[in-house]
Design a protein with these regions (language model features):
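Extracytosolic ligand-binding ectodomains
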Residues: 1-335
Length: 335
């Protein structure tokens, strides 16, 4: 069989999401379950130049059958437009349906916010926490995450309060509400860390929960001076019984100096694996690969299962892979 040629496209940026996704995709291409007969070219584009992504893709047109984008929502949306124009199978990690926009070539495998919210609420219902305060960033995405989470928690019988980011002078209402758990709904480490420290100054050792995007080595190191119970939304079984694919994934990252696998490592790994498997099934032809993907066949990955249809290019359903993980004494353990 002829080699499968895939382009890995990422912005020239130190954004942790793009860095982790591209590393996960690169390692999947080298050592993942679909790495045989796979050739990957990695290129970057200037995010401050609206035309640079198109120029990079134009250079590789006719030389690759698929493209993996380690890209944010606006970048992924543009990449999807270009993939449609150039007949490339395209995989990205975003969960926003605007990225797909009904394009046959585009598959987006991020976990939907509502699915994650329902899973987290179900898991928290099994704990001692019943009064949960949501502190969220003011971005559109995090406000939407907080709204989904608030609804899910209420539907699971818990008391919930929510508001956007607090500063030192704003903590009295939170103290009076007497939360069992504060869920810090932020993606940015530089924003989340000051909020966590302010909570500790004003509210003592109330339990904290952070989103899965903050479960990174750099953020864990920054938490060293923050005492108290600290949990994370997660998607891996850190100290339990991982699947064979998850174990191989974690061992591969560890061999390359990554001690804590992130969700974005996983999304990059699975995007590359799924794209390669589909193109292999389609003998390198994007149209045949899309037919295979849309047939509903289950793609098992380290981030869970995807089963795509013509009407669903996200492929996620049910409870999903969501777990809760405790950070305690320098170790991660599943709750």
């Amino acid at each position: 069989m002829k080699p499968i040629n895939i382009l890995l496209l990422r912005p020239e940026s130190d954004d942790p999401s793009a860095v982790d996704q591209s590393l996960g995709a690169r390692l999947s291409a080298l050592e993942g379950p679909a790495s045989s007969d796979l050739r990957v070219e990695e290129v970057s584009f200037r995010s401050d130049d609206p035309g640079d992504m198109e120029r990079q893709l134009a250079f590789w047109q006719g030389k690759v059958s698929g493209v993996i984008g380690a890209t944010n929502v606006p970048q992924s949306t543009r990449l999807g437009e270009l993939a449609e124009q150039t007949n490339l199978l395209c995989f990205v990690a975003n969960n926003n349906p605007l990225v797909w926009h009904g394009r046959g070539e585009v598959f987006h495998i991020g976990l939907p916010s509502i699915q994650t919210a329902l899973a987290v609420a179900s898991l928290l219902q099994k704990t001692r926490y019943r009064r949960i305060f949501l502190l969220h960033d003011q971005t559109e995405f995090q406000s939407r995450v907080a709204s989904s989470m608030e609804t899910a928690l209420r539907n699971h019988g818990m008391e919930v309060a929510a508001r956007s980011a607090l500063f030192d002078g704003d903590f009295e209402p939170v103290r009076e509400w007497q939360a069992d758990l504060i869920y810090v709904v932020f993606s940015s480490e530089s924003k989340a860390l000051p909020v966590a420290r302010a909570i500790r100054r004003h509210l003592g050792d109330v339990s904290l929960l952070f989103g899965r995007s903050l479960l990174r080595e750099s953020f864990l190191s920054s938490l060293a001076d923050i005492a108290g119970e600290t949990w994370f939304v997660d998607m891996f079984h850190r100290d339990g019984a991982p699947s064979r694919d998850q174990q191989h994934f974690a061992e591969t990252l560890s061999a390359h100096g990554i001690k804590v696998a992130t969700a974005n490592h996983g999304f990059g790994w699975d995007a590359m694996t799924f794209c390669a498997r589909a193109l292999t099934a389609g003998n390198g032809e994007p149209a045949l690969a899309i037919d295979h993907l849309e047939s509903g066949v289950a793609f098992e990955g380290v981030t869970g299962t995807c089963a795509f249809t013509p009407d669903n290019h996200n492929g996620r359903a049910g409870f999903g892979p969501t777990t809760l993980t405790r950070w305690s004494n320098g170790c991660l353990e599943e709750v």
